[in-house]
Amino acid sequence: GCDCSGMYGQKPGQPTWAELLFHQMEEKWQSPVCFHNTSVGGVDSEWAIENSSQRAANFHPDLVILGFGMNDRCGMEEYRNKTGRLIEAIRKVSPKTEFLLIASTLPNELAATEPHHFWAHQDEYSESLKGLEGMGVAIADIQAVQKEIGKRKRYIDITGNWLNHPNDYLARILAQVVIKTLGM
């Protein structure tokens, strides 16, 4: 949701997918929700592992939503391993925390060129996370939904920066997938 209109003061002023989720949680549960979005743009899951205590575990949260992968660009086994290490690092400090894993939304397929090769293995990440699913770990499969959308819409219709950031439309879809996965 890094390129939602609300971040730039543009109409219609839509919040990020995380803010949409937060508002839905409060509305659905009719009680205050303590929501910490400690994400940092442009980082990868190695950074998340290194910073897991201060960014997540020290809050002793009931739920952690992990959405890494866009900047990892590694193979699916390495991605699954890093995500598993991140879960373990958080559980060392906060053993009762549950997790919702989101494989990254997909970047522009045309971004597989020098110098960045931005499109790499991201389309494998949803499948790779299934090996971590189980007690206390669920998956919100935004990639399956985005792939279906891609059959009818051009990438420019769902991106805010033509490379990898969701626009208002895809951010709403992402929020809806997470909300549905959480059973709200």
Predicted regions and their residues:
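Oxyanion-hole/transition-state-stabilizing segment in secreted/luminal serine hydrolases
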Residues: S5, S45-N81, P107-N108
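Charged helix-capping and loop-helix junction motifs
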Residues: E78-L86, F118-Y125
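Serine-esterase "nucleophile elbow" of acetyl-processing enzymes
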Residues: G1-T38, S53-H60
